[in-house]
Swiss-Prot record:
The keyword Ribosomal protein does not apply. Residues 122-136 have a biased composition (Basic and acidic residues). Belongs to the TatB family. It is a single-pass membrane protein. The keyword Membrane applies. The gene is tatB. Coiled coil: none annotated. It is found in: Cell inner membrane. It comes from Hahella chejuensis (strain KCTC 2396). It comes from the Bacteria. The Tat system comprises two distinct complexes: a TatABC complex, containing multiple copies of TatA, TatB and TatC subunits, and a separate TatA complex, containing only TatA subunits. Substrates initially bind to the TatABC complex, which probably triggers association of the separate TatA complex to form the active translocon. GO terms for molecular function: protein transmembrane transporter activity. This is Sec-independent protein translocase protein TatB. PANTHER family: SEC-INDEPENDENT PROTEIN TRANSLOCASE PROTEIN TATA, CHLOROPLASTIC (PTHR33162:SF1). Residues 89-136 are annotated as: Disordered.
Length: 136
């Protein structure tokens, strides 16, 4: 990232030793390492975020182009025209309500049932015998 070679690093170490002294140099090196690590992480996060945003913008642009080729604008115009026509008919219906039909025509008629069906009588053998007896 910074393209620092060994000679440059050695020069920085010697200057740091002269300026800070042998007691504070390890502490300063540790703190410097922590800060460099934090900076690298931040740069990496920012770089990945920028990449994600660029990819998202590419996708939006591609979708926009695909939408143009599919004629979405034409479809949207057709839908809007249909909605306007439906609104016109709705206004006509609200201005001129239909006259109500007579109550007899508006209510559905149920089929009339004739007389209630009577149960069928079953003939038992004893009834047959009594009828034959009556005939004689």
């Amino acid at each position: 990232m910074f393209d620092i070679g060994f000679p440059e690093l050695a020069l920085v170490a010697v200057i740091g030793l002269l300026v800070l002294g042998p007691e504070r140099l390890p502490y300063a090196a540790r703190k410097t390492g922590l800060w460099v690590g934090r900076i690298r992480r931040m740069v990496s996060q920012m770089s990945s975020e920028i990449d994600r945003q660029l990819k998202a913008e590419e996708m939006r642009e591609r979708l926009r182009k695909e939408g143009d080729t599919l004629g979405l604008e034409k479809i949207q115009q057709t839908v809007n025209e249909a909605l306007a026509e439906a609104k016109k008919y709705e206004d006509m219906v609200e201005k001129n309500p239909a006259t109500p039909m007579s109550s007899k025509a508006s209510t559905p008629q149920t089929p009339s049932s004739g007389p209630d069906p009577q149960p069928v009588e079953s003939h038992s053998h004893s009834d047959d015998a009594s009828k034959q007896h009556d005939r004689s």
